[in-house]
Protein backbone atom coordinates (compact mmCIF):
# COMPACT_ATOMS: atom_id res chain seq x y z
CA UNK A 1 0.00 0.00 0.00
CA UNK A 2 2.77 2.45 0.92
CA UNK A 3 5.19 2.18 -1.98
CA UNK A 4 8.27 4.27 -2.64
CA UNK A 5 6.09 6.32 -5.03
CA UNK A 6 3.62 6.99 -2.20
CA UNK A 7 6.39 8.37 0.00
CA UNK A 8 7.90 10.35 -2.89
CA UNK A 9 4.52 12.00 -3.49
CA UNK A 10 4.46 13.04 0.19
CA UNK A 11 7.90 14.60 -0.25
CA UNK A 12 6.83 16.46 -3.38
CA UNK A 13 3.50 17.69 -2.00
CA UNK A 14 4.68 18.61 1.47
CA UNK A 15 8.19 19.95 0.85
CA UNK A 16 7.20 23.66 0.90
CA UNK A 17 5.15 23.05 4.05
CA UNK A 18 8.05 21.21 5.70
CA UNK A 19 10.33 24.18 4.99
CA UNK A 20 7.83 26.60 6.55
CA UNK A 21 7.13 24.42 9.58
CA UNK A 22 10.86 23.98 10.20
CA UNK A 23 11.26 27.77 10.02
CA UNK A 24 8.45 28.16 12.54
CA UNK A 25 9.76 25.52 14.92
CA UNK A 26 13.37 26.74 14.94
CA UNK A 27 12.22 30.32 15.58
CA UNK A 28 9.39 29.69 18.05
CA UNK A 29 9.67 26.34 19.83
CA UNK A 30 13.18 25.94 21.21
CA UNK A 31 14.17 22.34 21.75
CA UNK A 32 17.32 20.33 22.31
CA UNK A 33 15.85 17.11 20.87
CA UNK A 34 13.45 16.71 17.94
CA UNK A 35 11.57 13.43 17.40
CA UNK A 36 9.37 12.75 14.37
CA UNK A 37 6.94 9.87 14.88
CA UNK A 38 5.80 8.28 11.61
CA UNK A 39 8.28 10.37 9.63
CA UNK A 40 8.02 8.68 6.20
CA UNK A 41 11.35 9.51 4.49
CA UNK A 42 12.26 12.11 7.11
CA UNK A 43 11.19 15.20 5.17
CA UNK A 44 10.36 17.33 8.23
CA UNK A 45 13.29 15.89 10.18
CA UNK A 46 15.66 16.79 7.36
CA UNK A 47 14.39 20.38 7.21
CA UNK A 48 14.81 20.79 10.98
CA UNK A 49 18.37 19.44 10.71
CA UNK A 50 19.18 21.95 7.94
CA UNK A 51 18.21 24.81 10.24
CA UNK A 52 19.58 23.48 13.52
CA UNK A 53 22.12 20.72 13.11
CA UNK A 54 23.24 20.83 16.74
CA UNK A 55 20.02 19.38 18.18
CA UNK A 56 19.60 15.66 18.43
CA UNK A 57 16.99 14.52 15.93
CA UNK A 58 15.48 11.11 15.23
CA UNK A 59 12.62 9.95 13.05
CA UNK A 60 10.67 6.73 13.52
CA UNK A 61 9.00 5.04 10.54
CA UNK A 62 7.44 1.62 10.05
CA UNK A 63 7.46 1.34 6.22
CA UNK A 64 10.51 -0.32 4.63
CA UNK A 65 10.13 1.71 1.43
CA UNK A 66 10.27 4.99 3.34
CA UNK A 67 13.24 4.03 5.49
CA UNK A 68 15.23 2.79 2.49
CA UNK A 69 14.60 6.13 0.73
CA UNK A 70 15.30 8.28 3.81
CA UNK A 71 16.52 11.82 3.20
CA UNK A 72 18.78 11.73 6.25
CA UNK A 73 20.54 9.11 8.33
CA UNK A 74 18.43 9.67 11.44
CA UNK A 75 15.38 7.72 10.23
CA UNK A 76 14.96 4.48 12.18
CA UNK A 77 12.60 1.67 11.27
CA UNK A 78 10.23 1.13 14.18
CA UNK A 79 6.67 0.00 14.86
CA UNK A 80 5.15 2.75 17.01
CA UNK A 81 2.59 0.32 18.45
CA UNK A 82 5.45 -1.36 20.34
CA UNK A 83 7.12 0.11 23.44
CA UNK A 84 9.88 2.51 22.40
CA UNK A 85 12.96 1.96 24.54
CA UNK A 86 14.50 5.39 24.59
CA UNK A 87 15.51 7.55 27.53
CA UNK A 88 13.51 10.76 27.88
CA UNK A 89 15.63 13.84 27.32
CA UNK A 90 14.86 17.32 28.59
CA UNK A 91 13.34 19.87 26.21
CA UNK A 92 12.13 17.42 23.55
CA UNK A 93 9.74 18.41 20.78
CA UNK A 94 7.75 15.62 19.15
CA UNK A 95 6.11 15.81 15.74
CA UNK A 96 3.40 13.38 14.65
CA UNK A 97 1.63 14.49 11.48
CA UNK A 98 -1.15 12.46 9.86
CA UNK A 99 0.00 9.10 11.23
CA UNK A 100 -2.66 7.76 13.60
CA UNK A 101 -5.32 7.48 10.89
CA UNK A 102 -3.12 4.76 9.36
CA UNK A 103 -3.03 2.71 12.58
CA UNK A 104 -5.88 0.56 13.87
CA UNK A 105 -7.74 2.31 16.69
CA UNK A 106 -6.99 -0.60 19.03
CA UNK A 107 -3.37 0.64 19.03
CA UNK A 108 -3.88 4.34 19.78
CA UNK A 109 -2.78 4.04 23.42
CA UNK A 110 0.69 2.51 22.88
CA UNK A 111 1.43 5.02 20.11
CA UNK A 112 0.38 8.06 22.15
CA UNK A 113 2.14 6.63 25.20
CA UNK A 114 5.41 6.41 23.25
CA UNK A 115 5.04 10.02 22.14
CA UNK A 116 3.92 11.25 25.58
CA UNK A 117 6.71 9.52 27.46
CA UNK A 118 9.45 11.08 25.34
CA UNK A 119 8.29 14.65 24.73
CA UNK A 120 7.77 17.96 26.52
CA UNK A 121 5.89 19.56 23.62
CA UNK A 122 4.05 17.84 20.76
CA UNK A 123 2.85 19.05 17.38
CA UNK A 124 0.14 16.59 16.40
CA UNK A 125 -2.38 16.11 13.63
CA UNK A 126 -4.52 13.22 12.41
CA UNK A 127 -7.01 12.98 9.56
CA UNK A 128 -10.62 13.87 10.22
CA UNK A 129 -13.56 11.70 9.09
CA UNK A 130 -14.19 12.24 5.38
CA UNK A 131 -10.74 13.72 4.75
CA UNK A 132 -9.75 11.01 2.30
CA UNK A 133 -6.30 9.64 1.68
CA UNK A 134 -4.45 6.37 1.16
CA UNK A 135 -4.78 3.76 3.90
CA UNK A 136 -6.94 5.81 6.25
CA UNK A 137 -8.55 3.31 8.62
CA UNK A 138 -8.86 5.44 11.77
CA UNK A 139 -10.12 8.93 10.93
CA UNK A 140 -11.53 10.51 14.08
CA UNK A 141 -12.84 13.92 15.13
CA UNK A 142 -10.12 16.18 16.53
CA UNK A 143 -11.85 16.22 19.92
CA UNK A 144 -11.23 12.46 20.24
CA UNK A 145 -7.47 12.99 20.01
CA UNK A 146 -7.66 15.94 22.41
CA UNK A 147 -9.46 13.74 24.96
CA UNK A 148 -7.01 10.90 24.49
CA UNK A 149 -4.03 13.18 25.04
CA UNK A 150 -5.81 14.71 28.03
CA UNK A 151 -6.17 11.23 29.56
CA UNK A 152 -2.36 11.01 29.37
CA UNK A 153 -1.83 14.40 31.04
CA UNK A 154 -1.64 16.74 28.02
CA UNK A 155 -3.55 19.87 27.02
CA UNK A 156 -3.63 22.05 23.93
CA UNK A 157 -1.48 25.16 24.13
CA UNK A 158 -4.08 27.42 22.55
CA UNK A 159 -1.79 30.43 22.12
CA UNK A 160 1.05 28.44 20.54
CA UNK A 161 -1.39 26.55 18.31
CA UNK A 162 -3.01 29.79 17.12
CA UNK A 163 0.39 31.38 16.48
CA UNK A 164 1.63 28.34 14.54
CA UNK A 165 -1.52 28.08 12.43
CA UNK A 166 -1.50 31.81 11.63
CA UNK A 167 2.12 31.51 10.51
CA UNK A 168 1.38 28.47 8.37
CA UNK A 169 -1.72 30.06 6.81
CA UNK A 170 0.39 33.05 5.72
CA UNK A 171 2.23 30.91 3.16
CA UNK A 172 2.20 27.50 1.52
CA UNK A 173 0.53 24.82 3.61
CA UNK A 174 -1.51 21.68 3.17
CA UNK A 175 -5.18 22.16 4.01
CA UNK A 176 -5.14 19.26 6.44
CA UNK A 177 -2.42 20.94 8.50
CA UNK A 178 -4.41 24.05 9.34
CA UNK A 179 -7.54 21.96 9.96
CA UNK A 180 -5.97 19.28 12.12
CA UNK A 181 -2.72 20.45 13.73
CA UNK A 182 -2.33 21.43 17.36
CA UNK A 183 0.44 22.06 19.85
CA UNK A 184 0.18 20.07 23.07
CA UNK A 185 1.98 20.54 26.39
CA UNK A 186 1.91 18.64 29.66
CA UNK A 187 -0.86 19.80 31.96
Which stretches of residues belong to each language-model region?
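Conserved N-terminal segment of class I S-adenosyl-L-methionine
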Residues: 1-90, 95, 106-118, 129-132, ...
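Hydrophobic adenine-recognition pocket in adenosine-nucleotide-binding enzymes
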Residues: 99
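A short His-aromatic
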Residues: 102-103
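Short glycine-centered segments of the SAM/dcSAM-binding site in methyltransferase folds
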Residues: 121-123
Amino acid sequence: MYSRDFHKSIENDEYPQAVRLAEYITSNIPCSTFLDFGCSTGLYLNEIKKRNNIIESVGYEFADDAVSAALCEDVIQFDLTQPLERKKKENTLGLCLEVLEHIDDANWLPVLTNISNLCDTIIFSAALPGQGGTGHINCRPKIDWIRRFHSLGWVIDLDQTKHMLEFMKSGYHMGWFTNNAMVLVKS
